[in-house]
């Protein structure tokens, strides 16, 4: 009897977890599911324009979660992001910038954390490296680059330009 109850509880937990999993797996899917207030601004947002709105909070949660930089609660995966930032642009103190913006985001509710971090980070000396890191991971998730490919800023920029040109 106890085993059946435990099994049932486990099954329900699995189903609930599946129901809460992010349905999007690429930035493109996040853009397709963007809130109505931002539908006409996708091209602008792809140029890293910060926006304060509930729709942008949801969009940045989606994008940053898909590229692997935040978890489902908007918490920054600091070691993952820092490792890539240092590969992309080693001449900047990304750790200090990240600490500042993670601290700022920690004062926000979980639904606003990703966008708060994003907006803050765009205002730091990590801006160029962050853009490249997001773009690189977007390309990896879209299957346009492989993890075995070394980071090549020119290739990343060219592939992102192709995507942008197709959308905009």
UniProtKB/Swiss-Prot annotation:
GO terms for molecular function: odorant binding. SUPFAM superfamilies: Insect pheromone/odorant-binding proteins (SSF47565). Histamine binds at residues 118, 135, 138. It holds the Pfam family PBP_GOBP. Female saliva (at protein level). Female salivary gland. Not detected in female carcass without salivary glands. Not detected in male tissues. Disulfide bonds join 30-62, 43-168, 101-120. InterPro entries: PBP/GOBP, PBP_GOBP_sf. One of its GO terms (cellular component) is extracellular space. Residues 1-21 form the signal peptide. The keyword Ribosomal protein does not apply. Noradrenaline binds at residues 31, 46, 135, 138. Modulates blood feeding of female mosquitoes on vertebrate species by binding and sequestering different mediators involved in the host response. Binds serotonin, noradrenaline, histamine and adrenaline. Inhibits histamine-, serotonin- and noradrenaline-induced smooth muscle contraction. Exhibits vasodilating activity. Belongs to the PBP/GOBP family. This is Short form salivary protein D7R2. It comes from Anopheles gambiae (African malaria mosquito).
